[in-house]
């Protein structure tokens, strides 16, 4: 499969996508599609981040977060389907436009960087709750809230990883 082509009205980079979803309070199907791509890309971002350390405990925590990010992408795909937006499956890394060569951020694996990343994950629960509250569909809202609860787990894992690096 080839890399998905993004509609010109959608964010074109992962940085633009993160900024976009952070501002949305009542998501559209297009916003959910952006979220599918961001969540799917985040699996790869966590795997790439894990390459920056040789600490097996930190690697395991980062990989766990990455696996759950892909689960989040699949749940958002389910939201799109439930809301009548058709099929929009989470793409494999090589097909995700937000992972195009050189288009994604990479930061050194330090306790400070992991704590900063954790703040974003903790904010994810509030974002998903806002999105869930705006949806007039109980099944879709429940899927959003499930992702939100796991964002807090991601933040806690990142804090654990920071503590492991601090020894």
Segments predicted by a language model, with ranges:
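Non-heme di-metal
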Residues: 2-167
């Amino acid at each position: 499969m080839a890399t998905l082509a993004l509609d010109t009205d959608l964010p074109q980079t992962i940085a633009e996508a993160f900024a976009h979803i952070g501002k949305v309070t009542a998501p559209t199907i297009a916003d959910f599609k952006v979220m599918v791509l961001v969540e799917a890309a985040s699996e790869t971002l966590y795997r790439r981040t894990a390459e920056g350390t040789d600490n097996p405990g930190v690697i395991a925590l980062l990989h766990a977060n990455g696996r759950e990010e892909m689960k989040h992408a699949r749940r958002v795909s389910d939201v799109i389907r439930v809301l009548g937006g058709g099929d929009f499956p989470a793409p494999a890394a090589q097909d995700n436009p937000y992972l195009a060569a050189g288009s994604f951020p990479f930061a050194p694996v330090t306790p400070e960087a992991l704590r900063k990343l954790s703040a974003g994950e903790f904010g994810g629960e509030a974002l998903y709750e806002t999105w869930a509250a705006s949806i007039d569909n109980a099944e879709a809202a429940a899927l959003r809230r499930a992702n939100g609860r796991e964002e807090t787990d991601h933040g806690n894992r990142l804090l654990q990883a920071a503590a492991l690096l601090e020894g």
